[in-house]
Amino acid sequence: MKLRRKLFAAVSSLAVASAVLLAGCGAPAQDGTALKETGTLTLSVNPEIQIEYNRDGKVTALTGRNDDGKGIVEAYPDYIGKDCEDVLKDLIVEINEAGYFVDDIDGNKKNIVLQLEPGSVLPSDDFLADMSASTQDAVKGLNLSSGIVTIDDDDYDSAYAKDGKPSPYITLEKAQEIALTQANVEAADAVFDDKEFDHDDGTPIFELEFTANGNEYEYDIHAVTGKVVKAEHKTAGTQS
């Protein structure tokens, strides 16, 4: 009789444990561990536009992150369900028609920054590269010469990650790449004499000074968006 009771107790405990295990498998993951089913790609020229897309790469929402971006989004209402690369091309056309590529930065056309939010779903392994290629096609089609810079998960400085959240700041190396692209300078030709990370009036900025081919450059890069905030250079042989 005692043996039967022990056997029954053991079987009951096993059943309870199995039920708990199965319930855990069927329960939704906690917010911190759930896999994202959407992604966010931000396009920055002067307008900053946040593009939200689903696992299939279809656009679900557009949001202007500054006043210029809001104006572009208002002028482009027909985007829901379109492929992300097609929306990017359309936005480049809209931005060009609005005159944002007219002004140069330090003698060169403005960079186009494509920034992928950390943890975003990737419809394909080459998603960001494909978006960059589509943007480049749009740029060439408009006879523009803007450089294109991409920012993905590997380009955020892990030293500033905390509380399980990714760092909001790009790395110094990415800031240097952005500066060189805007200046139209090859990395092999550049020597960085000064590089500081500072909060200028509350804005996180990389302050960079470098020389290339005898010219002296001073560039400020926004540490969150990757936008060029300041850009100037002194040509070799000219006076200060």
Model-predicted segments: where are they?
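Bacterial N-terminal signal peptides that target proteins for export
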Residues: K2-S12
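Bacterial signal peptide processing site
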Residues: G26-A29
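Exposed beta-strand-loop-beta-strand "reactive/processing" segments of non-cytosolic proteins
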Residues: E117, D125-D130, T135, V185-E232, ...
